[in-house]
From Swiss-Prot:
Homotetramer. Belongs to the SIS family. GmhA subfamily. Zn(2+) binds at residues 61, 65, 172, 180. Keywords: Carbohydrate metabolism, Cytoplasm, Isomerase, Metal-binding, Zinc. It is found in: Cytoplasm. Pfam families: SIS_2. Residues 37-193 form the SIS domain. This is Phosphoheptose isomerase. GO terms for cellular component: cytoplasm. The gene is gmhA. It catalyses: 2 D-sedoheptulose 7-phosphate = D-glycero-alpha-D-manno-heptose 7-phosphate + D-glycero-beta-D-manno-heptose 7-phosphate. Binds 1 zinc ion per subunit. Catalyzes the isomerization of sedoheptulose 7-phosphate in D-glycero-D-manno-heptose 7-phosphate.
Amino acid sequence: MYHDLIRSELNEAADTLANFLKDDDNINAIQRAAVLLADSFKAGGKVLSCGNGGSHCDAMHFAEELTGRYRENRPGYPAIAISDVSHISCVSNDFGYDYIFSRYVEAVGREGDVLLGISTSGNSGNIIKAIEAARAKGMKVITLTGKDGGKMAGSADIEIRVPHFGYADRIQEIHIKVIHILIQLIEKEMVKA
């Protein structure tokens, strides 16, 4: 009944991944991001991650697998997803939604830490403000974006961009693959410590 639709969806997902893989800059950016994160951890730093909607879930998933585990048991790594509901509702009410991540970065971010901002459009105002706050704190910034990078293009130390201009879910599918690879590479780098 839906076999053609199912095949079409899976083929489109495979095509999006294949297009991402064609660009060696994407592979290099993933490697550089993993090394940057591991170097921060080795120096006593942490990563703060943020996103909206599905990207918020990806930010939490990233932090959870760093503090908990990915595939194998190992020590937890210092990662915080900016996802505290009381913080988000307070800042949204008192300052505005654009400040939900930046206020948290201002409060707990330190020089040597890393911000991971995830936005499929690259136009999330609250992540742009978080990047500005991270810069003011002397933090490094990694972004996972899509399409043409939006307003976030060029704002990070390392941008990993999925150049897909269709639905956001295709971009998110690559983002979660990148997140898992980042964790795998971080684990390899931390063994070298």
